[in-house]
């Protein structure tokens, strides 16, 4: 029997919001059994708690955003990198206090979160872990993109990207990853978010990527990568999309299945979660 888990002690970080450009402080605290993962907007009066659940997802551009009762003013966004780390460390119960509507982006990957989780430690709790097992395929599509989850006895992720862009097209576009914490830390967690330099002005006009820099993202032009050290992995682009997807799908909690995505992003990932939980015949509790 798998047990629920939380962190052994709290930790705090500061950083900048990727899209808002605002300085953010965040403290992650242990939580009791069956608490789930809860974000607390400590900057609001009274404070607002937003539980991580598919029903809290609100459609957003270029990130995953959760709201309290659908209220855009009571929200927390860009949670996917932290959630990705939580998924791999099997964290079930935790309280995240944040003083802004967006999490700090750190270096654009989940690596710093993995190191903090290793540092504070993970503890088992005296209650069975709750999750679901996929019994039949569930798939969502948009144009030529799709995201699906298939029955599997192991937790597995597969991602394929396709960009008509000379730099990204020159890299490996496909990755398969079976759950393994050490492998995740080594081969996935350091992959950074990326963006196209030519789109930066447009993004800023739409209040996006205001906190983006070469310290927290891979900058891409038609000629190459702007970051002085280049890419961390030859196929960093597809690895980061995998990192994001792991975090997005963990909004649904522990789901045993084989996730398979083609050109999927946050919107399609989130739609897949909704489709899974809407079809009661597609899964069973474990």
UniProtKB/Swiss-Prot annotation:
Enzyme's top EC category: hydrolase
Annotated GO biological process: lipid A biosynthetic process
Gene3D superfamilies: lpxc deacetylase, domain 1 (3.30.230.20), lpxc deacetylase, domain 2 (3.30.1700.10)
GO CC terms of this entry: membrane
Binding site for Zn(2+): 81, 240, 244
Enzyme Commission number(s) from the entry: 3.5.1.108
HAMAP family: LpxC
Family of this protein: Belongs to the LpxC family.
Name of the protein this chain belongs to: UDP-3-O-acyl-N-acetylglucosamine deacetylase
Lineage: Bacteria, Pseudomonadati, Pseudomonadota, Gammaproteobacteria, Thiotrichales
């Amino acid at each position: 029997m798998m047990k629920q888990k939380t962190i052994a002690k709290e930790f705090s970080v500061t950083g900048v919001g990727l899209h808002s450009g605002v300085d953010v402080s965040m403290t992650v605290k242990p939580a009791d059994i069956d608490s789930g993962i809860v974000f607390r907007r400590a900057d609001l009066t009274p404070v607002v708690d937003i539980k991580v659940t598919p029903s809290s997802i609100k459609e957003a551009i270029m990130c995953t955003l959760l709201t309290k009762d659908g209220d855009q003013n009571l929200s927390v966004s860009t949670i996917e990198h932290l959630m990705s780390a939580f998924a791999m460390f099997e964290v079930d119960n935790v309280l995240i206090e944040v003083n802004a509507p967006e999490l700090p982006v750190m270096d654009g990957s989940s690596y710093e979160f993995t190191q903090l989780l290793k540092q504070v430690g993970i503890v088992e709790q005296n209650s069975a872990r709750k999750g679901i097992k996929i019994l039949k395929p569930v798939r969502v599509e948009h144009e030529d993109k799709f995201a699906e989850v298939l029955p599997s006895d192991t937790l597995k992720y597969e991602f394929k990207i396709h960009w008509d862009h000379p730099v990204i097209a020159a890299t490996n576009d496909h990755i398969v990853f079976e759950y393994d914490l050490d492998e995740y830390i080594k081969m996935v967690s350091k992959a950074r978010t990326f963006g196209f330099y030519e789109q930066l002005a447009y993004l800023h006009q739409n209040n996006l990527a205001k906190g983006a820099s070469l310290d927290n993202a891979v900058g891409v032009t038609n000629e190459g990568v702007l970051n002085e050290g280049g890419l961390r992995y030859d196929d960093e682009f597809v690895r980061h999309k995998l990192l994001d997807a792991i975090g997005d799908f963990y909004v649904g909690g522990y789901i045993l299945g084989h996730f398979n995505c083609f050109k999927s992003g946050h919107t399609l990932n989130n739609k897949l979660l909704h489709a899974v939980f809407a079809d009661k015949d597609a899964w069973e509790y474990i």
